[in-house]
């Protein structure tokens, strides 16, 4: 268990600074961090292309949408964090209409603050590995690398229901 560090500032999709630290210290939440690689997929090494969980951002987001009320009823907000440019992220949010809070971390603040794993395409574009954090009481209770994006929401909901975090 890790206390959420201070001074993690991300961006909202309307480009406003957002104090993620203050938010995460005062809200229980499930944070899914997705790579949304897009065209850069072809520029990944063969090993990365074969890594489980590299594809599936849309399925992951839509499944969180389907279970959002259940997360909320258990006292958890759902937050989606991506590192692509804000225009692309805004388009993704509009396409999935999930109703979750989307935040942008194109500066990789979470990588520095929490040492979250990242990777890069051959053109230098950097991405987070797909991962989900369960935050409760201002503490990061668990961090999971996600290799089955389509099952992530269901799996996290089960962990919360069973207090397995």
Enumerate the language-model features and the residues they cover.
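Chalcogenol-based redox active-site neighborhoods
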Residues: 1-165
């Amino acid at each position: 268990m890790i206390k959420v560090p201070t001074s993690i500032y991300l961006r909202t999709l309307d480009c406003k600074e957002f104090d993620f630290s203050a938010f995460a210290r005062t809200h229980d939440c499930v944070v899914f961090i997705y790579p949304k690689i897009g065209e850069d997929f072809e520029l990944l090494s063969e090993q990365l292309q074969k890594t489980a969980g590299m594809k599936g951002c849309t399925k992951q987001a839509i499944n969180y949408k389907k279970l959002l009320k259940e997360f909320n009823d258990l006292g958890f907000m759902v937050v989606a964090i991506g590192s692509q440019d804000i225009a692309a992220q805004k388009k993704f949010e509009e396409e999935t209409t999930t109703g979750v809070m989307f935040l942008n971390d194109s500066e990789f603040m979470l990588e520095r603050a929490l040492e979250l794993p990242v990777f890069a395409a051959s053109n230098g574009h950097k991405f987070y590995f797909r991962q989900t954090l369960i935050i409760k009481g201002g503490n990061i209770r668990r961090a999971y690398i996600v290799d089955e994006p389509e099952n992530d929401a269901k799996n996290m909901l089960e962990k919360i229901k069973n207090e397995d975090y």
